[in-house]
């Protein structure tokens, strides 16, 4: 996928607050304008902190540091290590889970994923499938919350009980320790009529 425009939040400055960025293809970026003389056929792009010098230098420094340390590749390798370890644990305990990695974002699905049908381009029609199966949605939500709480009780912080992020700071030893903690949770998982309990 090659986006027409990409918008970044504070990650563009290594987590520094009040930072963001917009980038994209020239044909679209040239239609952006700032200041009073935006002219016809241009979209005004600006904000309170636009071109803030401190945010700009934070962003520049973050990008240079990412290049110097090869941070994205390192984080991706640690994501692969975590994902491979999770898959091995899932197999070991015969759990109906799915783990996959997208760069440095590891997904751990402990219950069926929700899906929308956007073919009609109507939110109402798209959401109808979910509404027809709302009992399953509640079971899914409950299972995810329980698994997320079990992870947290074992020192694992996830996003919504299903996503984990690796970074340059993660080492093989840190990933292995995380996998030991996941194993503590996985060996206690039980399937019930109300979903999975840990």
Model-derived regions: residue spans:
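Conserved N-terminal phosphate-binding loop of PLP-dependent enzymes in the Aspartate aminotransferase
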Residues: 1-198
């Amino acid at each position: 996928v090659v986006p027409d425009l990409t918008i970044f939040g504070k990650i563009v400055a290594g987590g520094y607050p009040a930072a963001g960025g917009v980038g994209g293809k020239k044909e679209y970026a040239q239609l952006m304008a700032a200041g009073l003389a935006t002219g016809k056929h241009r979209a005004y792009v600006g904000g309170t902190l636009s071109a803030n010098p401190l945010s700009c230098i934070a962003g520049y420094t973050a990008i240079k540091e990412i290049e110097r340390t090869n941070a994205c590749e390192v984080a991706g390798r640690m994501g692969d290590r975590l994902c491979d370890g999770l898959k091995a644990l899932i197999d070991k305990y015969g759990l109906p889970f799915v783990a996959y990695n997208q760069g440095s974002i590891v997904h751990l699905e402990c219950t069926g994923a929700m899906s929308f049908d956007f073919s009609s381009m109507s939110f109402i029609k798209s959401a109808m499938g979910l509404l027809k199966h709302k009992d399953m949605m509640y079971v899914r939500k409950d299972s995810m919350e329980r698994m997320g709480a079990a992870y947290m009780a074992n020192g694992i912080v996830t996003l919504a009980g299903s996503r984990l992020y690796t970074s340059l700071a993660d080492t093989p030893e840190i990933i292995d320790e995380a996998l030991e903690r996941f194993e503590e949770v996985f060996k206690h998982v039980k399937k019930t009529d109300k979903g999975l309990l840990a």
